[in-house]
Amino acid sequence: MISINNLQKKFGEKLAVNIDHYEINQGDMLGLVGNNGAGKTTLFRLMLDLLKADNGNVVINDIDVSQSEDWKNFTGAFIDDGFLIDYLTPEEYFYFIGKMYGLKKEEVDERLLPFERLMSGEVIGQKKLIRNYSAGNKQKIGIISAMLHYPQLLILDEPFNFLDPS
């Protein structure tokens, strides 16, 4: 599913990512652990073609992410609240994301049902813009939107950072 080949990214003199070769197979679940500044987020941004690699490439389902956008159809991601359109309500944002994947409003509503417990009555129906939500609720909105279209590949960066233990 994912092949990382000779991937390098430097910021000035600091080598942030240096991966000779790594394969992630369909169905694998992988967690990256490392110190702050170790390159985890940089790797995710390279995988999502949000950063240009200095060398190498990332291939998802035989698609080089830097050469085509077809991989986006089966990939969901949430890196940080910069992914959110914070002048929308959560409902508007979910419908916007759904529309990008060809989902009707009714389908989006149906796909939100399994997330009701996660939202804890604090996200939907609040008549607030995303910018006015807590960091934890923004995190929930981002995670849910990344999963809305049932992606084959889900990339989440520090997904539990701002979430309550409950």
Q: Model-found features: residue ranges?
A:
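Conserved structural motif at the start of ABC-family nucleotide-binding domains
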Residues: 2, 17-19, 72
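The feature captures the beta-strand-to-loop junction immediately N-terminal to the Walker
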Residues: 33-35
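Helix-to-loop junction immediately C-terminal to a conserved catalytic motif
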Residues: 48
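Conserved ABC transporter NBD signature motif
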Residues: 56-71
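Conserved ABC ATPase signature
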Residues: 129-134
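A short, proline-enriched helix->beta-strand linker immediately N-terminal to the Walker B motif
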Residues: 148-152
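Catalytic Walker B motif of ABC-type/P-loop ATPase nucleotide-binding domains
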Residues: 154-158
